């Protein structure tokens, strides 16, 4: 199929959306979605077209791949003040294969950037991989990145990754296929340079289930939340890791984005984004590790508060909790380490370190270690180590160290304390 055409320009209203890509013919690849039209003065931007779906598989061939979402949602024109970026198109789904491997899902398009006071557009989601009757499942498409804001505005959210396709069972005369890989989540867009929040990272796609006798694939890692560049803005949260296919490990959670630094002497700094949770493991698979919390922004002169460290993501079932983020300079507290997930031995995350004291201000208290996960099968998880207290500056005192996390209960043996 041919690519979709760009949307027509609006006269008094919003710009048109990009056309969708045509679906592929039998055994053929589809067209990509067209780009959204750019916004003119005082108009909003068009949304990027969606990618076409893959064509049906031929008698012995694999299905066509999903088309990519439009490369960019439209960007606000330089003469426009309040124009938001267009959203990226979604990737098409890969076709299921009767004989051969499932086709890959298309990638999501990136969100467009905002104009002077516009927010960024959201990234498109990745398409799902096709399932296989006699072969491997297709990979999920990658989520598109969120668009960045102008001077004032929020960043666009990152798109989610597509899920991997299911592999075939080893039936007589058939090939046992592995599951497709989950697509990565898209990165969140940056907040405005003066004010605005950074956006959340996209969720990682789930790993595909493997055919009988094969392990499923590992879930994809959640994307990192983007930092905010403006005053009082908060960092985006990390995307959640994808769930593992049967027998496959869960994907790791994305890290939290950095908190924004206040530009005025009296404004407060933004807090860190939290780390994404680790994906749960498939049956027999290990849970993914939680993402670490980001570091809190430092305080400015004349006592604006430092941002608190982001919370570590929880471990997926059986996975380790992510570490808490460190507090910014002048911060009161480091973040608490995340609790380890229940499982065979989920360990608690490490507490974040307390921030350094500002002039004549005491150091921050270290975050508490996460609790170990409780197990019904074997030993409980260990508690996480407490964070270090922050050092005092000038004539100020240092911060206290964080408490260790409690050990998880075991079926027969209790876990050790932090």
Residue locations for each model-derived region?
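Collagen triple-helix signature
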Residues: 1-418
């Amino acid at each position: 199929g041919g690519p979709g055409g760009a949307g027509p320009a609006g006269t008094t209203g919003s710009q048109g959306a990009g056309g969708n890509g045509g679906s592929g013919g039998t055994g053929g690849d589809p067209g990509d979605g067209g780009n959204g039209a750019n916004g003119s003065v005082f108009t909003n931007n068009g949304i990027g077209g969606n990618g076409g779906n893959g064509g049906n598989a031929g008698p012995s061939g694999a299905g066509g791949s999903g088309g990519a979402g439009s490369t960019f949602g439209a960007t606000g024109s330089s003469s426009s003040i309040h124009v938001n970026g267009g959203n990226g198109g979604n990737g098409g789904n890969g076709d299921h294969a009767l004989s051969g491997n499932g086709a890959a899902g298309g990638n999501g398009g990136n969100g467009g950037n905002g104009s002077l006071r516009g927010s960024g557009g959201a990234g498109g989601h990745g398409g799902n991989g096709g399932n296989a009757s006699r072969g491997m499942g297709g990979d999920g498409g990658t989520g598109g990145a969120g668009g960045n804001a102008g001077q004032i505005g929020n960043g666009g959210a990152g798109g989610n990754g597509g899920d991997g396709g299911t592999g075939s069972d080893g039936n007589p005369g058939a090939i046992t296929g592995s599951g497709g890989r989950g697509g990565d989540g898209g990165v969140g867009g940056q907040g405005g340079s003066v004010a605005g929040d950074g956006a959340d990272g996209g969720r990682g796609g789930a790993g595909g289930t493997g055919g009988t006798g094969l392990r499923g694939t590992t879930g994809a890692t959640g994307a990192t939340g983007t930092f905010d560049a403006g005053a009082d803005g908060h960092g985006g949260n990390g995307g959640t890791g994808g769930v593992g296919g049967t027998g496959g490990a869960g994907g790791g959670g994305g890290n939290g984005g950095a908190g924004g630094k206040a530009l005025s002497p009296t404004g407060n700094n933004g807090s860190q984004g939290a780390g994404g949770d680790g994906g749960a493991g498939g049956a027999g698979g290990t849970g993914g590790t939680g993402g670490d919390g980001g570091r809190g922004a430092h305080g400015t002169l004349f006592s604006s508060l430092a941002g608190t460290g982001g919370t570590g993501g929880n471990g997926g079932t059986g996975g380790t909790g992510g570490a808490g983020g460190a507090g910014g300079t002048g911060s009161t507290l480091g973040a608490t380490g995340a609790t380890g997930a229940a499982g065979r031995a989920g360990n608690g995350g490490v507490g974040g370190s307390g921030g350094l004291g500002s002039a004549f201000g005491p150091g921050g208290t270290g975050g508490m270690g996460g609790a170990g996960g409780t197990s019904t099968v074997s030993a409980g998880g260990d508690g996480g180590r407490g964070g270090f207290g922050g050092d005092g500056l000038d004539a100020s005192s240092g911060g206290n160290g964080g408490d260790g996390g409690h050990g998880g209960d075991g079926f027969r043996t209790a876990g050790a304390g932090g």
